[in-house]
Amino acid sequence: MLTKQTTGQAWKQIKGSITDVKGFTTAGAHCGLKRKRLDIGAIFCDVPANAAGVFTLNQIQAAPLKVTKESLAHSNGKLQAVLVNSGNANACTGASGLVDAYEMRALAAAKFAVPEEMVAVTSTGVIGEKMPMEKVRSGIEDLVLSKESTPFAEAILTTDTGTKEVCVEVVIDQKTVRIAGVAKGSGMIHPNMATMLGFITTDANIETAALKRALAKATDETFNRITVDGDTSTNDMVLVLASGLADNQPLDETHPDWANFYGALSACAESLAKKIAKDGEGATKLIEVQVAGAVSDEEAGKVAKAIVGSDLVKTAAYGKDGNWGRIICAIGYSGCTLDPDTIDIAIGPYETLVQSEPVVVDDAAISKYMEAETIVIKADLHQGQGVGKAWGCDLTYDYVRINAGYRT
């Protein structure tokens, strides 16, 4: 259970999802984009919500991404509905793909009786296939909003093994505020905010500009610190919608409870990021890398991501092999500032390298530790005060099997 004490307040994780936030309902349906599973869904807010988005840095961007960016720009950061489909990415589909994304936005706007510029459109699935709009039109018509979140959480999945949901509660101005999220992602995960989609709802009253800054920072510290296979998708997107119905005083960085709000938002994002990393295609375990002693937090994060993204480290994790040589190799090519003679490495509670000198280790004990569902790798560079984390998963035979047969 997530807990964290902040300045006189506390945020905590509770049972719930995005519909347990005031003002939000969702829907999910099957329209035939996938063989049997739900494949189209929507989030709806009773009021125009202050909204922000963070998008893939892949230069090839899917049509729905472009439409959603346009919506946010034209509405001055307001959204009231989000339409999502899985099974088709609508990426690299030319001018007709953009036409289809606009039509999806228009259909959702009509369905939920909101202006088109207050609708976001997101898609995930196979790249390069035209969107079968007859199926999509039927699916949008079949959407029925409710406070049940599971159909939506299922409708956004592709190769995921299960839904990913979280809900966090925090006190702001003596008002209970909730921040909740739902995400999908299992393969093609190396976001610089793969495919990775994240949707966060909150009933906090927060200024749009502050919400945008908070999401960007939280994304950089969480979603951008996960990797499964090194691929950055054309469709990566994280959206946050704030209904304001908690009725707190408007939040920005000058608000006395800002640290509480940001801590809760970051916790929500981190929980989703870990769920994505742990659910990497074929994965059997989550890998968390903690780096200290870097010259800056940014460099610490870079080192952590280099370690967790190393195929050799990932395969060693699968094989329960405490091969720290692969870890120090990743540190060396990470591009960070370091002294090769002052590095410490530990795998779980076991020190393997101190001041760049090998330590006599119990290989059997380390291997036993690495049987766990979550393993922690620590590195200290002794160059400064910078700290950072990253998350990933082991690399298994099943990853190849799943991706070799993705379209079959």
Curated annotation (Swiss-Prot):
Sites marked Involved in the stabilization of negative charge on the oxyanion by the formation of the oxyanion hole: 124-125
HAMAP family linked to this entry: ArgJ (MF_01106)
Pathway info: Amino-acid biosynthesis; L-arginine biosynthesis; L-ornithine and N-acetyl-L-glutamate from L-glutamate and N(2)-acetyl-L-ornithine (cyclic): step 1/1; Amino-acid biosynthesis; L-arginine biosynthesis; N(2)-acetyl-L-ornithine from L-glutamate: step 1/4
Official protein name in the record: Arginine biosynthesis bifunctional protein ArgJ
Residues where substrate binds: 158, 184, 195, 281, 403, 408
InterPro entries: Arg_biosynth_ArgJ, ArgJ-like_dom_sf, ArgJ_beta_C
Tagged with keyword Amino-acid biosynthesis: yes
Keyword line: Acyltransferase, Amino-acid biosynthesis, Arginine biosynthesis, Autocatalytic cleavage, Cytoplasm, Multifunctional enzyme, Transferase
Family to which the UniProt record says this protein belongs: Belongs to the ArgJ family.
